[in-house]
Regions:
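Juxta-kinase regulatory segment immediately upstream of eukaryotic protein kinase catalytic domains
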Residues: 1-26
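Conserved ATP-binding subdomain of kinase catalytic cores across diverse folds
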Residues: 25-28, 32-42, 48-167, 247, ...
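ATP-dependent phospho-/nucleotidyl transfer catalytic cores
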Residues: 26, 30, 55, 61-65, ...
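Protein kinase-like catalytic core scaffold
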Residues: 51, 87, 110, 213, ...
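Hydrophobic alpha-helical bundle architecture
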Residues: 113, 285-306
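Catalytic activation segment of kinase domains across protein kinase-like and atypical kinase folds
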Residues: 222-263
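Active-site activation/catalytic loop segments of kinase-like enzymes and analogous catalytic loops
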Residues: 248-292, 308-327
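Long, compositionally biased intrinsically disordered regions
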Residues: 350-354
Length: 369
């Protein structure tokens, strides 16, 4: 690590109530949003303690203090449910008692206690890994089932407001700033044909059949930590996007990413479909983790959550393609269109297996009528 950067990191860490002297610091993890460093400290008894120092990316999170207020509220609430300290992220306070430090550049920094003896997977190595990740996110819902979700800040407004995303998509089609709309008429029709579906979750929320809950909003497997030895779920991490939302969208985003048989930008669409065994595994893990806290009406909307997150993501890729690839990072011409195609194929496969998806989740309802 660059010597000047190391000195900067060490100086930042001194503003927090970490235990011991810093003996090493190095860049850590593969996250793209925040700059992250792993610190190793040696306390007065010769015990090594490790911490994770992060800079919050203010181009993504416009109100870092709201992000940190959400994280503090949720982690404080979760602590009584933890069987051991590793079961919940632990924020280290700065010397003034706050959960973040602002340096002279106006950057926001925070420190978490490192979760020892754990592994973080980008992809499940076994179906049990996928089950355990699902269980972790389900237990997150169970433990927060009585948390007043409406007290959290909406740090990214309309993040999963699919009707709003559709409005943005229609505007992109109409404006056609890059002259690409004519070449993607079939793709545009695909999303227009499903317009009546986009309000399903909000409509159910308004009816009271889909309660507002704390949603994580980034339920990829690498945001759940597993024990290194037992491979059992330890906890959920990366809480930057926690907001008021729906349990079914957390479930759905995990399915979109984890139960697909191919990468998000796979060009050969014959390789893309919904792995029903993985869907079943995740549903079982998630609902076992929820421990009966979800309403039957919520459980029956889990397939809608999976389809909604997938169709919304595909729509966002196409919107970005129409607008000139200004939001998602692309690696070659047409990359966003390729991503859009995989999501379209996944949606179509979900529709083809709809009755099966519904039957799988119905088995977990309290009322089997």
């Amino acid at each position: 690590m660059d010597r000047d950067l190391e000195l900067t990191v060490r100086d930042l860490a001194e503003h927090f109530k970490i235990k011991g002297q810093i003996i090493s610091c190095e860049p850590y993890g593969g996250g793209h949003i925040n700059s992250t460093f792993l610190l190793a400290c040696l306390d007065e008894n010769g015990k090594q303690r490790r911490y994770v120092l992060q800079r919050i990316n203010q181009s993504v999170f416009k109100s870092p203090e709201q992000v940190m207020a959400n994280i503090k509220a949720v982690t404080d609430y979760l602590k009584p449910f933890a069987e051991e300290p590793r079961n919940v992220l632990t924020l280290i306070k700065n010397q003034d008692g706050k959960t973040f430090y602002i340096n002279e550049k106006g950057e926001y920094w925070r420190i978490y206690r490192f979760i020892e003896d754990s592994i973080c997977l980008d992809l499940p190595e076994t179906t049990e890994d996928f089950y355990q990740s699902a269980y972790a996110f389900g237990k997150f819902q169970r433990d927060l089932s009585n948390f007043p979700a409406d007290t959290l800040y909406e740090t990214i407004p309309d993040f999963h407001n699919t009707p709003k995303r559709y409005e943005t998509f229609l505007k992109a089609v109409e404006e056609d700033v890059c002259g690409r709309a004519a070449s993607v008429a079939e793709e545009i029709k695909f999303f227009k044909d499903r317009k009546d579906f986009y309000s399903v979750l909000i409509d159910n929320c308004n009816k009271g059949t889909l309660p507002l809950r704390v949603s994580h909003n980034d339920t990829k497997i690498n945001n759940s930590m597993l024990d290194f030895k037992t491979r059992k779920a330890i906890c959920v991490i990366d809480l930057d996007t926690i907001m008021p939302g729906f349990s079914v969208t957390d479930f759905g985003d995990a399915i979109r990413f984890g139960a697909s048989t191919a990468a998000e930008d796979e060009k050969d669409l014959s390789k893309v479909w919904l792995d029903m065994d993985m869907f079943k595994t995740y549903a079982e893990g998630f609902l076992d983790g929820c421990g009966g806290q979800l309403l039957d009406s919520e459980i029956m909307l889990l397939p809608e959550g999976a389809k909604m997150m997938t169709v919304e993501c595909g729509m966002r890729f196409l919107t970005d393609y129409l607008q000139g690839d200004t939001y998602f990072k692309i690696h070659h011409e047409g990359h966003n269109l390729e991503r859009c195609h995989t999501q379209m194929k996944l949606v179509a496969d979900m529709e083809a297996h709809w009755d099966e998806m519904k039957a799988i989740v119905k088995k977990h309802c309290k009322n089997q009528q």
